[in-house]
Design a protein with these regions (language model features):
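Catalytic-core "active-site belt" of small-molecule-metabolizing enzymes
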Residues: 2-203, 241, 245, 255-261
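Short strand-turn-strand beta-turns centered on an Asx-Gly dipeptide
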Residues: 188-189, 231, 251
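A conserved acidic, glycine/proline-rich C-terminal tail/linker
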Residues: 205-237
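Short, charged beta-turn/beta-strand-edge "cap" motif at the junction between a beta-strand
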Residues: 234-238, 252-255
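Carbohydrate-binding surfaces in secreted/extracellular proteins
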Residues: 248
Length: 261
């Protein structure tokens, strides 16, 4: 693995992320040719950045999102501990080309789901959930034209991982079965009031969580106890600028806010 093309690609992408810089594309010798090669590059990021994986994100959990970045389905990526902040935090948009806030249902896992041959069922995944949270994800890509980078490079790019605002925890109860009907009301300081629902995330945030657990399982990785999964945008991505603030009400799951600088 030492000085392999995959490691060189991970180094180039991760260092661009740390520096707030962007690339046109990975050079051909380093460019992944498949989703599997992209995942292999992604798996090397943690060692390059020297940080723990606090949780996992899912990009493109709606048909509109998949069309926007020209991918066939969702893409998973890690969220690193250094970029997780609490409710009410201010997030810098310096170097961020996407400049959107995404209001998402988040699950914290209380029991590790290890790799195994057979897929995890919905009931098994739900039994591993310890907490739910409201969340605001602030993605970005290392690629200047992320819309045309392709799913292999976007997987290598950790599915546009960047900043995560994580709200207070609430214990799961029977209402977790009704998340498709959950209304999420956002408010932006400029007067916009976009609204969405849990059904916008693969039909159900729990379905997205199950997809992520089995995506990791299939690639030989565990969804570890203590990690969170942010499941995708319930509300269409909200364009934000420095000086603005976004608040989101997730009903029984709670409220969250983030300011931007």
């Amino acid at each position: 693995m030492q000085n392999s093309p995959a490691l060189q690609a991970a180094q180039r992408l991760a260092r661009s992320w740390l520096a707030g810089e962007h690339l046109d594309d990975l050079p051909p010798p380093l460019r992944p040719r498949s989703l599997e090669e992209g995942r292999a590059i992604q798996a090397l990021w943690a060692g390059v950045v020297g940080d723990a994986i606090a949780g996992w994100k899912i990009a493109a959990t709606s048909e509109a999102g998949q069309r926007h970045i020209a991918v066939a389905g969702p893409i998973a990526g890690p969220v690193f501990a250094r970029r997780v902040v609490c409710d009410g935090a201010t997030v810098s948009l310096a170097g961020n080309r996407m400049r959107v806030a995404e209001c998402e249902v988040v699950f914290t896992i209380g029991r590790t789901l290890d790799p195994r041959p057979q897929p995890y069922s919905r009931s098994e995944v739900l039994a591993a959930v310890q907490w739910l949270h409201p969340g605001i994800k602030v993605p970005d890509s290392r690629f200047r034209e992320f819309e045309r980078a392709g799913e292999a490079q976007l997987a290598a790019d950790c599915a546009c991982c960047n900043d995560m605002v994580l709200g207070a925890a609430v214990a799961p109860d029977e209402r977790i079965q009704a998340l498709p009907a959950l209304v999420v009301q956002a408010r932006v300081s400029d007067g916009r009031t976009p609204q969405g629902a849990g059904r916008n995330v693969l039909g159900d945030p729990v379905a997205a969580l199950c997809w992520l657990a089995n995506e990791l399982r299939a690639s030989g990785r565990a969804l570890e106890a203590g990690q969170f999964v942010t499941t995708g945008a319930c509300v269409a991505p909200i364009a934000v600028l420095p000086g603005q603030r976004v608040e989101a009400d997730f009903g029984w799951i709670g409220r969250i806010a983030a300011s931007f600088a």
